Amino acid sequence: MSELGLFINPKDGGKPIELTKDNYPLTFITKITTHPRYPNRDQRNKSVNVPGLSRYNVVIIPSALCHFLAYGSVQMVRVGSYWTSGDTFHCYYDEFGGPDGWLPGSDGESHFFLYGTLKDNPPDTYGLFLNAGASAAIDNFRSITQENEVAYCVYRKKIYIDVNNNRGYWSLPNDIPNRSSALVFLRPESTSQVLRYDRPNNRIISWGAGWVYVVVFSYGLNLQPADGLTIWNKQGKVVFNSDYIPFFNNGHTIKMSGNVATSSFEKPMFSMDMPNTWLENERVNVNCYLSGFRVENNKLIANRMWTIDFYPSYANYMYNQVVYSSSYCIDFNDYF
């Protein structure tokens, strides 16, 4: 344990955490949804202005980066890269996309959740500042102040998903604020269980029954004064308390290659948001399967689930039985 920091023992009774100059909370900035058709169908580079974005060191958590459509032949539309510059978020599509013709499991929309840490705090900022020692200069972006919109761990449990009684579905609890923008991280106990997060319906879908570790982060909680640390803004609203563990910076993004992605954590939890439709060429048709992931140690492995439809065409071999996806990872040992 460090001698410098804030020790949080949350009210959910789960594993505590220590916030330090190296482990510090991330502020929710915004959620961005993009589509290859809009606002300009002839531009692959899409940009969204986010006022004040340049004030942050930004962490981008992606969802649903790849979609398939068909106009006679099957086409892939994928976000190949994404980044921020100043007050602007950018993403670049590998191909152009049409207004319709999307194969089952695709709608063309990709989602990006932007979190960050302030580069500098305003002169009148107050709160908790984490730095290297009492004599060190304040490291401004490692802080919890009245300027932050901190996301919190609002749910962390080991749950059982039953395919017999609940058809393999598990919905997020209704009392989670901003459910459609919540970050959901999963780790199944069995290496054979296949999971995906169905964001439009705020639920986990499982191929096979089993125990799953779930951690959910969200923002917009109606915070009340806590017995530990409480920070109010100038309007008298509580903007931080130590009843909950905040979403903090100990995470990283991985990208699928050959249907496998590997985390640097020994025992990671993964976001499994909306992987693309799994396509399989079968005679004159391409079968469309729902896709998901299973977990082996620190590896995330793409798998097909069940058939959702077919299309009378043939998919390019590059699209056949392949998931193009990215995942954000957190360390299981930070939460359980």
Named regions from a protein language model:
Residues 67-84, 190-199:
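Low-complexity "stalk/linker" and mucin-like segments enriched in Ser/Thr/Pro/Ala/Gly
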Residues 1-56, 65, 80-173, 199, ...:
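Extracellular receptor-binding modules and their adjoining Ser/Thr/Gly/Asp/Asn-rich linkers
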Residues 48, 285-294:
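N-terminal accessory interaction module
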Residues 141-149, 183-187, 194:
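Short secondary-structure transition "cap/hinge" sites
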Residues 232, 294-295:
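Hydrophobic alpha-helical segments, especially N-terminal targeting/anchoring helices
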